Amino acid sequence: MYLKKYNLKNKYALVTGAGKGLGRACAIALAEAGCNLVIVSRTKRDIDSVSKIIKKLKVKCKSYICDVTNYNEIKSIINKQSRIDILVNNAGNNIPEHFTKVKTKNMEYLVKVNTIATFNIAQLCAIKMMKLKNRKKVGGSIINMSSQMGHVGGPIRSVYNMNKWGLEGLTKGMAVDLAKYNIRVN
């Protein structure tokens, strides 16, 4: 419904966190615009549900169950693709805890999911995008899903704030580095 006026036919998008929420909505909207999809989620039931909807829209859809913090697993998925034009880097998580009560294991997990995995996926996809012979002509897009928490502080969200502020900086740096390849980063 949302992207029907856009023509993304013959484009290929990778969407992480595609099983629920924003990732699911983005994957379906891209498919409605004619985009072929590679969707990634941690849970089989969620990814199967989204895949079923996308396939009804008569676009190609490959689905993978994957924990994005597993570098080798996500790298393998990305390397299997012949082409990626769009990345919706959406996978993420939050464990609300008061700053003074943040458990180290929770902080490390959130940094791994929200920052390190996001960086790794963006880097792997950017490298794949840059290899396309006519990339400068056809362009590419990387969308790093942030949050208002990347701009303001919030209660019981210190670690999430930290991750999203870092993501904002990463996105700006990537935009500068990838502009000469006509890869837009937002």
Ranges and model annotations:
Residues I127, V176-K180:
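Alpha-helical segment proximal to the catalytic Tyr-Lys
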Residues A122, N163, T171:
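Active-site helix of classical SDR
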Residues T100, V152-S158, K180-Y181:
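Active-site loop immediately N-terminal to the catalytic Tyr-X3-Lys motif
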